[in-house]
């Protein structure tokens, strides 16, 4: 799980204000940080299937948000993809 400080740094970097957690960019960045954390956990615990399922759920949620941005706000999509170094 990410700490409050990490989450606040993400909000400050990608959000429109200090309490902006609703924009797709902030949500994608938070999901990405959680995905990175769960990926590290699964490297140490490869048989933890409930965590693996949670990871797949997060990847799906992030993908849906990325698809939304790609369809409606292509420049914002390209910016967040490049900043987070996500594959296409």
UniProtKB/Swiss-Prot annotation:
List keywords of the entry alphabetically. Answer: Ribonucleoprotein, Ribosomal protein, RNA-binding, rRNA-binding
Q: Which PROSITE patterns match?
A: RIBOSOMAL_S15
Residue ranges with Basic and acidic residues bias = 1-12
Instruction: Identify the GO cellular component terms for this protein.
Output: cytosolic small ribosomal subunit
Q: Where is this region: Disordered?
A: 1-24
List, alphabetically, the SMART domains matched: Ribosomal_S15
Q: Which GO terms describe its molecular function?
A: rRNA binding; structural constituent of ribosome
What domain of life does the native source organism fall in? Bacteria
One Pfam match, by short name? Ribosomal_S15
GO biological-process terms attached to the record: translation
The answer to keyword Transferase applying to this record is no
Family of the protein in this entry: Belongs to the universal ribosomal protein uS15 family.
Q: Which HAMAP family is this protein grouped with?
A: Ribosomal_uS15_B
Q: Subunit info?
A: Part of the 30S ribosomal subunit. Forms a bridge to the 50S subunit in the 70S ribosome, contacting the 23S rRNA.
Q: What does this protein do?
A: One of the primary rRNA binding proteins, it binds directly to 16S rRNA where it helps nucleate assembly of the platform of the 30S subunit by binding and bridging several RNA helices of the 16S rRNA. Forms an intersubunit bridge (bridge B4) with the 23S rRNA of the 50S subunit in the ribosome.
- Protein name in the entry: Small ribosomal subunit protein uS15
The top of its lineage is: Bacteria, Pseudomonadati, Rhodothermota, Rhodothermia, Rhodothermales
């Amino acid at each position: 799980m990410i700490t409050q400080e990490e989450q606040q740094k993400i909000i400050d970097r990608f959000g429109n204000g200090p309490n902006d957690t609703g924009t797709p960019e902030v949500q994608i960045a938070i999901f990405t940080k959680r995905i990175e954390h769960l990926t590290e956990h699964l490297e140490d615990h490869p048989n933890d299937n409930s965590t693996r399922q949670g990871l797949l759920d997060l990847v799906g949620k992030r993908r849906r948000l990325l698809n939304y941005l790609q369809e409606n706000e292509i420049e914002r999509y390209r910016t967040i993809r490049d900043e987070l170094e996500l594959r296409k």
